[in-house]
Amino acid sequence: MRLIPSRLSYLFLHLFAFCYYAQVTIQSPPNFTQHVSEQSKVTDRVSRRLIRTYQLYSRTSGKHVQVLANKKINAMAEDGDVHAKLIVETDTFGSRVRIKGAETGFYICMNRRGKLIGKKNGLGKDCIFTEIVLENNYTALQNVKYEGWYMAFTRKGRPRKGSKTRQHQREVHFMKRLPKGHQIAEHRPFDFINYPFNRRTKRTRYSGER
């Protein structure tokens, strides 16, 4: 008779273990889509970045976006113009990018009035754009800091205020083109971009080197 309590305890223990295992197995898997969405909104200072070089052809002006030495931005450049060559750096593993003129080194940014300006330091969110591929195969560039405001140019190639732009407007539509004379094989697929380290990025980098 003394064996009965011990057997009951043994059975209850097995039943508890079975219930726990069943509860763990029916839990929903991690939401990878949500993780990607959240991480795409945060600047990635650790991963290797993709750098591309191309021109942006404006649908309305029929010419190319250029970054001038006086920090002005317009869409009046001819194909192959030295100021139309743009260096595009990925900000995250999503579709956020920084765009700067290869000749001047100024980043294309947007101020609080919606005006496009050139800046030497492109780390702020006002200098980050989200690439949106449209159904007509054109690309729209929405500013990250001022959501709903797009890079846009008039028929004469003058920049249009971001507050007056919408995704369906022709003024915000662009087409990527290789610089004149450049071949696809000439592009370096990856490169490193140096950012100021904070304590967290230092710790992550050092742990990866061990």
UniProtKB/Swiss-Prot annotation:
It is found in: Secreted. The keyword Protein transport does not apply. CDD domains: beta-trefoil_FGF8. Gene3D superfamilies: 2.80.10.50. Disruption phenotype: Morpholino knockdown of the protein causes a dramatic loss of cilia in Kupffer's vesicle. Keywords: Growth factor, Secreted, Signal. Residues 1-27 form the signal peptide. SMART domains: FGF. Its main location: secreted. One of its GO terms (molecular function) is type 2 fibroblast growth factor receptor binding. GO terms for biological process: animal organ morphogenesis; anterior/posterior pattern specification; brain development; cardiac ventricle morphogenesis; cardioblast differentiation; cartilage development; cell fate specification; cerebellum development. It comes from the Eukaryota. GO terms for cellular component: cytoplasm; extracellular space; lysosome. InterPro entries: Fibroblast_GF_fam, IL1/FGF. Monomer. Homodimer. Plays an important role in the regulation of embryonic development, cell proliferation, cell differentiation and cell migration. Required for Kupffer's vesicle ciliogenesis. Belongs to the heparin-binding growth factors family. This is Fibroblast growth factor 8. It comes from Danio rerio (Zebrafish).
